[in-house]
Regions:
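A local structural motif
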Residues: 31-34, 155, 217-219
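A structural signal for short secondary-structure junctions
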Residues: 194, 214-215
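Short beta-strand-to-loop elements that line the ligand-binding cleft
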Residues: 36-39, 220-224
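Short, solvent-exposed loop/beta-turn-alpha elements that line the ligand-binding surface or hinge
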Residues: 211
């Protein structure tokens, strides 16, 4: 995107982030309107893509949204870059130093309350070390501090919206109904806000969409391909 003006249609959940980026461009002395934030609803996106001044489109988001953007941009033969939803695996092999691996696993999952697109989604553990891994894993997850993300000692904050929290809870329930064992959590706390208790389901339904929040899904096998 170097050398080009940018129009940013940010997630409706966090418009403040986009406005802050725009302000940084302004303070850095870039020409006015070189970077603009569009506070519009998702149903207006096609109008933006169709505009003849827009030469390329990029999206970081869900697979379903990516299909719609690719379809509209493809109709007009516009360049497209898509970074879509996934279920990124984190592999723990039998020679792993668990004292190092477990904190790394947890940090990679609960970053930004699990709502970061680069957060690990699934943790696949070699069966021979599963019990020891789960013991350390659950112990350290249960020690996480849930609360105000502006407080320094908080490690897990709320989800962006209550409906996202409720959807997450339903996904956990469905995993348990399909045979998953909940090693920790699995409940909505009584505290105000869109919080969800740190949760560890084991052997969940692998077909589920990626889970946001402080939910860490584990499974095991005799080799990484299991």
């Amino acid at each position: 995107m170097a050398g080009n003006a940018v129009l940013l249609k940010r997630s409706s959940n966090v418009p403040g982030c986009a406005l802050a980026i725009e302000e940084i461009f302004h303070q850095a002395g870039f020409p006015a309107n070189l970077f603009q934030t569009l506070l519009v609803s998702s149903d207006k996106v096609n109008l933006i893509i169709e505009n003849h001044l827009v030469k390329a489109v990029t999206l970081t988001g869900s697979t379903s949204a990516g299909r719609e953007v690719a379809k509209k941009a493809g109709e007009m033969l516009k360049k497209t870059v898509l970074e879509l939803g996934g279920s990124d695996p984190y592999l723990i092999l039998e020679d792993a130093a668990l004292e190092t691996a477990v904190p790394s696993c947890i940090k990679s999952r609960i970053i930004n309350s699990g709502q970061s697109c680069i957060a690990a989604k699934r943790f696949i553990v070699v069966e021979s070390i599963r019990k020891k891994f789960e013991e350390l894993f659950v112990r350290q997850m249960s020690a996480q501090k849930m609360g105000d993300p502006m407080e320094e000692n908080t490690t897990i904050g709320p989800l962006a919206r209550h409906d996202l929290r409720d959807t997450l809870h339903q996904q956990v329930i469905k995993s348990i109904e399909k045979g998953a064992k909940c090693l920790l959590g699995g409940e909505i706390p009584e505290s105000k806000g869109a919080f969800y208790l740190p949760t560890v389901p084991h052997r969940g339904d692998k077909r589920n969409a990626s889970l946001p929040g402080g939910v860490i899904r584990t499974s095991s096998g005799n080799h990484p391909g299991s």
